[in-house]
């Protein structure tokens, strides 16, 4: 069970990084970032079951879920604002911070 959790976590992390690097759409990049956060939480739970009591891993997991929810809400609000102004959510067309 331990190895399966780590393999699934590594797979989610690789898919998330690949999606983050190759995506041109902001929403797709946010979804890839959420996959990375899910891989982190799966690692916390898997490793806490092996090395420590479960409470420590669950506390860190709840913290990561809270950070991921705040990141998703902020990212979607920014993507919606850029879509309203630029009519596109492509990352390469979003040059709002350039002088």
UniProtKB/Swiss-Prot annotation:
Q: Name one GO cellular component term.
A: NADH dehydrogenase complex
Q: Gene symbol?
A: ndhE
- Tell me if Glycoprotein is a UniProt keyword of this record: no
BP GO annotations: ATP synthesis coupled electron transport; photosynthesis, light reaction
What is the name of this protein? NAD(P)H-quinone oxidoreductase subunit 4L, chloroplastic
Role noted for this protein: NDH shuttles electrons from NAD(P)H:plastoquinone, via FMN and iron-sulfur (Fe-S) centers, to quinones in the photosynthetic chain and possibly in a chloroplast respiratory chain. The immediate electron acceptor for the enzyme in this species is believed to be plastoquinone. Couples the redox reaction to proton translocation, and thus conserves the redox energy in a proton gradient.
Q: Where are the transmembrane segments?
A: 1-21, 31-51, 59-79
Task: State whether it acts alone or in a complex, and with which partners, per the record.
Answer: NDH is composed of at least 16 different subunits, 5 of which are encoded in the nucleus.
Compartments annotated for it: namely: Plastid, Chloroplast thylakoid membrane
Q: What class of enzyme is it?
A: translocase
Xref: InterPro entries: NADH_UbQ_OxRdtase_chain4L/K, NUOK/Mnh_C1-like
Give the record's membrane topology. Multi-pass membrane protein
| Keywords of this entry | Chloroplast, Membrane, NAD, NADP, Plastid, Plastoquinone, Quinone, Thylakoid, Translocase, Transmembrane, Transmembrane helix, Transport
Q: Which GO terms describe its molecular function?
A: oxidoreductase activity, acting on NAD(P)H, quinone or similar compound as acceptor; quinone binding
Q: Does the keyword Transmembrane helix apply?
A: yes
